[in-house]
Amino acid sequence: MKEVLMRIYSSKEENLEDYINKLFEGGIRGAVVLQGIAGFGKGREFHSEEIEVLSYELPVVIEVVEDREKLLNFLKENRETFKNCYITFERVKVWE
């Protein structure tokens, strides 16, 4: 099995629960949600919890370790759900 680490970058305001439910329903082994304290994305808008802003769209990263082909198939089937996310893959070795 060729496991990879998939990271899904999004903002807190986007529907995080939908993402997690899709991963769960898709048979993905597990997912971890990490919330950033500051960041910016493609729109070049800075988000931080230390600066008073009208919107607290703080960055969120969902990490998943799973078989590469399974993740690619999952993303093809759920393209519409994750269309506004930035997604990366990294090779990993899973300790057993």
Swiss-Prot record:
Gene3D superfamilies: 3.30.70.120. SUPFAM superfamilies: GlnB-like. InterPro entries: N-reg_PII-like_a/b, N-reg_PII/ATP_PRibTrfase_C, UPF0166. It holds the Pfam family DUF190. Belongs to the UPF0166 family. This is UPF0166 protein aq_448. It comes from Aquifex aeolicus (strain VF5).
